[in-house]
Amino acid sequence: MSVLQTPEKGPVIHDWRPEDPAFWGRSGKQTARRNLWISIPALLLAFAVWMVWSTVIVRLNAIGFSFSTDQLFWLAALPGLSGATLRIFYSFMVPIFGGRRWTALSTASLLIPALWMGFAVQNPSTPYNVFVLIALLCGFGGGNFASSMSNISFFYPKSQQGTALGLNAGLGNLGVSVMQFCVPLVISFGVFGFMGGQPQVLADGSSLWLQNAGFIWVPFILAVTVIAWFGMNDLSSARASFSEQAVIFKRKHNWLMCWLYLATFGSFIGFSAAFPLLIKTSFPEVIALKFAFLGPLVGALVRPLGGWLADKLGGAKVTLWNFVLMIVMVFGVLHFLPKGGEGGSFYGFLGMFMLLFITTGVGNGSTFRMIPVIFRTLHEKSALGRKPEQREQALKNAGKESAAVLGFSSAIGAFGAFFIPKSFGTSMALTGGPEMAFYMFVGFYLSCIVVTWWWYARKGAATPC
């Protein structure tokens, strides 16, 4: 198989000028699109493997295991902990190794937890500690997001980064809903025949192939790994050592945007991880897996809308009002929850949670759009009155710092995949319900409104965006 060629006839591109309209129209746009549309399925698979435990835990006890509700919430939360931690390192990998190489290698790493899970669930004597380790390894999928977003940011001009990053993240985020929709289907029959192992027999006499929750992703992981290796590009202009990228830790706006992204993406991925078990514990009469995929689906689909709105209206304005709506939706969810195990309305709860997922998706897109604008503005100000070559270097530095911040903030945001499921588990253990956790989220969103308004949205803000 031959490498898909660029105008430079190779996988490494040495001349990359997306801000040059002539270059962009001649060859840049086509190359950027190709890398984006290979990146998207790779990221979709990463999210599917990362969040697969959110579905598996709902059925584990039905096939012979005896784990407590708190233990099950831990299995849902642990991929978030490991994935978020890996993102811290993955966010610096693309400038060191190249986007093509790293996308292929990180996608291939998903084979480890996918295969191991498939074998482990077939043995009812598999200890809980083994499942803990597999759940942690599923964090490989969570780590991929940071490097993917960093990589795509290098390919697009500033004016189109919001839409491009929104598409990459939004369609990649669909991996959660695709997984939560497909897994209940594929575990209901022997997809792989004798190669997939024997079914587990449930108490009512029906059969379940829970191993398919892991095995189903293997052929797709292999295919996308090959496509990424031969179809994507490495940009030499995006190369930077860790020390060059580490300057972001001195940037105030890096930490501010990490705080905001923890509220938007952290909420999206945390609610996605906890939603199936939250439905099951709050509304036991409802078949959770019939509805669980809907929240991540709408949240992922509207993420590009958040980037587009930020391009048109300004990222800070969209983000500010989005946080206000998130608070309103949380109170709506609380209104429809059962009180003391009685009352409540599942469909009211579901509707308000869908609206909450929509706001997390819009916020994901708008906050990510803010980052490149903020750092380009800062570097443009620093280069005022300087020589043309110094201004050009300032723009390159802005691009590298933006990419590093995109990756690092996504790492911090991913901790929501750990904290939100664990918050629900702790709230239920202490109070018998999830309400305490929701009130904590409201307090956090209020702090984000203050940060967004003061530094980015108010009249006279130092860095409007």
Where are these regions (language model features)?
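Cytosolic juxtamembrane N-terminal segment immediately preceding the first transmembrane helix
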Residues: 1-48
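Glycine-rich segments within core transmembrane alpha-helices of 12-TM secondary carriers
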Residues: 142, 162-191, 406-420
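Central cavity-lining transmembrane alpha-helices of secondary-active solute carriers
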Residues: 74-92, 293-306
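Extracytoplasmic gate region of multi-pass secondary transporters
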Residues: 50-58, 251-300, 304, 364, ...
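C-terminal membrane-cytosol helix-exit motif in multi-pass small-molecule transporters
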Residues: 188, 216-238, 451-455
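C-terminal ends and interior cores of transmembrane alpha-helices
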Residues: 108-124, 324-342
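Hydrophobic core of transmembrane alpha-helices in multi-pass small-molecule transporters
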Residues: 127-143, 344-364
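Conserved MFS/SLC helix-loop-helix module at the cytosolic interface between two early adjacent transmembrane helices
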Residues: 85-128
